[in-house]
């Protein structure tokens, strides 16, 4: 749905989650980094998440590793 193209390999905007396009199908991708912030009047965790995408026959798998700062 308009999310194809080499320039859009790793969009980090939350609205683009699940709309990744990998140029080399069947090969592991790099990891993209996104910032998790807070929303006013909502209790969201603060932290840094790292998204790793893997393509297998153009099927995308996404794993997210969250790292929170020490209190």
Swiss-Prot record:
Phycourobilin 3 binds at residue 58. It is found in: Plastid, Chloroplast thylakoid membrane. Keywords: Antenna complex, Bile pigment, Chloroplast, Chromophore, Electron transport, Membrane, Photosynthesis, Phycobilisome, Plastid, Thylakoid, Transport. (2R,3E)-phycoerythrobilin binds at residue 49. One of its GO terms (cellular component) is phycobilisome. The keyword Glycosyltransferase does not apply. Contains four covalently linked bilin chromophores. Phycourobilin 1 binds at residue 25. It is a peripheral membrane protein. Phycourobilin 2 binds at residue 34. GO terms for biological process: photosynthesis. Critical for the incorporation of phycoerythrin in the phycobilisome complex. Heteromer of 6 alpha, 6 beta and 1 gamma chains. This is R-phycoerythrin gamma-1 chain, chloroplastic. It comes from Gastroclonium coulteri (Red alga).
């Amino acid at each position: 749905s308009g999310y194809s193209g080499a320039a859009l390999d790793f969009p980090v905007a939350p609205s683009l989650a699940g709309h990744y396009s990998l140029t080399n199908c069947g090969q592991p991708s790099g990891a993209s980094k996104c910032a998790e912030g807070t929303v006013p009047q909502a209790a969201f965790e603060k932290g840094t998440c790292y998204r790793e995408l893997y393509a297998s026959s153009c099927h995308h798998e996404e794993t997210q590793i969250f790292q929170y700062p020490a209190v």
